[in-house]
Structures are given as structure tokens and as C-alpha cells.
A protein has these predicted regions:
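Carbohydrate-active catalytic/glycan-binding domains of CAZyme proteins
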Residues: 1-184
Length: 184
């Protein structure tokens, strides 16, 4: 990402699966922006899907994605990755740049966006359960997009991406990370 419209792959989310990461089978198209809700249905938003993520949770799928000007959290009806999909109330999820999901050991889900904003999600995925907080590293800016959190060896690791100069499209596009003992 970061290369503008020429780098966006289209208006669909497609899935492949593999048991050993060598041989892949095409599952199919699981989302098409023609399904996009009225609040996000501008002509430009229907053209592109940006940074989709899929997560499995208690017998259903969760998906976050970014059309051009909005972001969305969707949940499946059940175990079929092809859906049907339902959008969470858009007020809480609208306008979150490059959203990502993280599930903590206690089952709590968090929405991360803009690389350093995080908020707990309500248990029914109907919105945010808390006001967002910023999780910055102590000594520098970590970036502006491409965020994700993993728990590794008991530490929370926030990954992010940004241009090395902290100026868009100048320098190299780098991966950054920082660690913490708690998620917020």
C-alpha cells in the first residue's frame, strides 16, 4: 500500500487456503463492494477495497476493511467464510484509517487504527466499548498505517509501517515495532 490508486487491487475480497503454505486452493470471492452500505456507497468507495483482514471468533468470521474514505467491521452469520456478512453500526467504525483487530488472551477484542489508536470493542461487535487511547512508543513516532498487534512471549508487540522520513512517499517504506507489558 502507499502507492495510490494504481496499487489497489479492486473492489473484492478473495480468499485462498492451504494446509502447508505451498499448495493453495481458491475459496472464492467473499465480499464485493457492490454490497457496501448506503453510508459508504459513494462511487469512489465502491471501487476499492483496502487492507482487508479476516479473523475467526467463536464460530463466525470477522472482517475489517477500508474502502477509500471509510472503514468497516463485518461479521458473518456463521462458519461459512463466504457469509452472508453484516456490517457493525458504522458510527463507531467510520473513518478509521487502516483498521486492524486484536484478540487478547481473555477474549477481549480491540480495534486498532491510524497505527496508534486503540479501543476495546463491545462483546456483540455493535460498537466500541471504550474511548480510544493512543499507544505511542516512548521515544519516537511509530508510523501512520499498517498496524497490527501480536502477543509474543507475554509482551504486546505493535507493528506499524511508515516512510523513513515521516513524510509521505519520501525515503523507504519501513516496518516498525514497539513492545509493552499491557495492551493500552
Amino acid at each position: 500500500s502507499g502507492l495510490g490508486r494504481s496499487s489497489i487491487v479492486g473492489n473484492t475480497v478473495r480468499v485462498w487456503k492451504s494446509r502447508e503454505l505451498t499448495n493453495w486452493a481458491y475459496v472464492g470471492e467473499i465480499w464485493n463492494n457492490d454490497q457496501i452500505a448506503a453510508h459508504a456507497a459513494s462511487a469512489s468507495n465502491k471501487k476499492f477495497v483496502w487492507a482487508p483482514e479476516l479473523h475467526w471468533d467463536n464460530g463466525k468470521w470477522l472482517m475489517v476493511k477500508c474502502p477509500q474514505d471509510v472503514s468497516e467491521l463485518l461479521t458473518s452469520d456463521g462458519s461459512d467464510i463466504k457469509g452472508p456478512w453484516h456490517e457493525a453500526p458504522f458510527q463507531d467504525f467510520l473513518g478509521k484509517h487502516d483498521p486492524s483487530l486484536f484478540k487478547d488472551d481473555d477474549g477481549t477484542w480491540y480495534l486498532i487504527w491510524g497505527n496508534t489508536k486503540i479501543a476495546e470493542i463491545k462483546k456483540d461487535f455493535s460498537g466500541l466499548a471504550a474511548d480510544p487511547v493512543n499507544i505511542f512508543p516512548a521515544n519516537r513516532k511509530i508510523g501512520h498505517e499498517g498496524c497490527t498487534i501480536k502477543k509474543i512471549g507475554g509482551k504486546y508487540v505493535l507493528f506499524g509501517t511508515a516512510w523513513s522520513t515521516d513524510t509521505g512517499r519520501h525515503g523507504t517504506y519501513n516496518l516498525y515495532y514497539c513492545t509493552a507489558d499491557k495492551v493500552t
